[in-house]
């Protein structure tokens, strides 16, 4: 699964996911399913924000190519992917500036057009079940919830899907592609089932045990993540590197 993640996600997303896991004391090399889930969630958040701007009249517009007009601002503020301290700083700044209610939990995005925080969910289960779990945890009518599944289903607060149909279709297509690529590598079942994941982990660890009298092979594979990557939110064109195309999973 770790190799799949590093091959199939943009290196910037991989690095952000690694940092997020290490912040909570988690190891991407061990908790590989969580690693894949975090990368998927990050990518959906970036795709949700990508191409969407607000013009000088306050109208939401989509700009897919060319140099964006200087008067345009990003419609969405990306909160997911930042370290907790910086994320709360951004949330507090937004609340102080707009007067919106401060959320109890860190949201994923802020929509400057609708003036609301957004919680993005990506689930391997039934969308309505995951939606209810999110709503029960957040316990706030102010935070908008939008859930996507790997089967193309989605569910949002009051059936308000925020984005246009084409933008949502891009996200659904990407999720379906990830599912298909996982399945072709025999990874999907363990990704969906925690029990199967534990069984696979035990199997992998057993296979990694050095045999008596056999030389131990040590892998020195270098992470493709950019070592000098600047945080994407510090760049005015923070999603430009992700726009052209998300890396397509190479076939074995």
Curated annotation (Swiss-Prot):
User: Where in or outside the cell?
Assistant: Host cytoplasm; Host nucleus
Q: Name one GO molecular function term.
A: RNA binding
Q: For site (Important for efficient shutoff activity), what residue positions does UniProt give?
A: 202-203, 206
Which UniProt keywords are present, listed alphabetically?
Decay of host mRNAs by virus, Eukaryotic host gene expression shutoff by virus, Host cytoplasm, Host gene expression shutoff by virus, Host mRNA suppression by virus, Host nucleus, Host-virus interaction
- Coiled coil (residue ranges): none
Instruction: Tell me the Gene3D superfamilies matching this sequence.
Output: Influenza RNA-dependent RNA polymerase subunit PA, endonuclease domain
Q: Which residues form the active site?
A: 80, 108
GO BP, sorted A to Z = viral RNA genome replication; viral translational frameshifting
**Swiss-Prot/TrEMBL site (Important for efficient shutoff activity and nuclear localization) positions:** 195, 198-199
Instruction: From the UniProt annotation, give the residues forming the signal peptide.
Output: none
> Taxonomically, which superkingdom?
Viruses
Q: Which family does it belong to?
A: Belongs to the influenza viruses PA-X family.
Q: What does this protein do?
A: Plays a major role in the shutoff of the host protein expression by cleaving mRNAs probably via an endonuclease activity. This host shutoff allows the virus to escape from the host antiviral response. Hijacks host RNA splicing machinery to selectively target host RNAs containing introns for destruction. This may explain the preferential degradation of RNAs that have undergone co- or post-transcriptional processing.
What's the record's remark on domains? The probable endonuclease active site in the N-terminus and the basic amino acid cluster in the C-terminus are important for the shutoff activity. The C-terminus acts as a nuclear localization signal. The C-terminus is recruited to host protein complexes involved in nuclear Pol II RNA processing.
> What name does the UniProt record give this protein?
Protein PA-X
Q: Which organism is it from?
A: Influenza A virus (strain A/Gull/Maryland/704/1977 H13N6)
| Chain's gene name | PA
């Amino acid at each position: 699964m770790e190799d799949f993640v590093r091959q199939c996600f943009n290196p910037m997303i991989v690095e952000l996911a690694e940092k997020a896991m290490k912040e909570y004391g988690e190891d991407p090399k061990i908790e590989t399913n969580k690693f894949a889930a975090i990368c998927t969630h990050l990518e959906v958040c970036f795709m949700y924000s990508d191409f969407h701007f607000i013009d000088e009249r306050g109208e939401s517009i989509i700009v897919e190519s060319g140099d964006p007009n200087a008067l345009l601002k990003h419609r969405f503020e990306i909160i997911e992917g930042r370290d907790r301290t910086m994320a709360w700083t951004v949330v507090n700044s937004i609340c102080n500036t707009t007067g919106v209610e401060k959320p109890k939990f860190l949201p994923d995005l802020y929509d400057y057009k609708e003036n609301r925080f957004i919680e993005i969910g990506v689930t391997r289960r039934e969308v309505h079940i995951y939606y209810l779990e999110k709503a029960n945890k957040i316990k706030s009518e102010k935070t908008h919830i939008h859930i996507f599944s790997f089967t193309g289903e989605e569910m949002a607060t009051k059936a308000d899907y925020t984005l246009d149909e084409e933008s949502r279709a891009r996200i659904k297509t990407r999720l379906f592609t990830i599912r298909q690529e996982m399945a072709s590598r025999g990874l999907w079942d363990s990704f969906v089932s925690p029990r199967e994941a534990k069984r696979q982990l035990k199997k992998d660890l057993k296979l990694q045990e050095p045999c008596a009298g056999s030389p131990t092979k040590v892998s020195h594979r270098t992470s493709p993540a950019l070592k000098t990557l600047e945080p994407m939110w510090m760049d005015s064109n923070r999603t430009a590197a992700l726009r052209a195309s998300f890396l397509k999973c190479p076939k074995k």
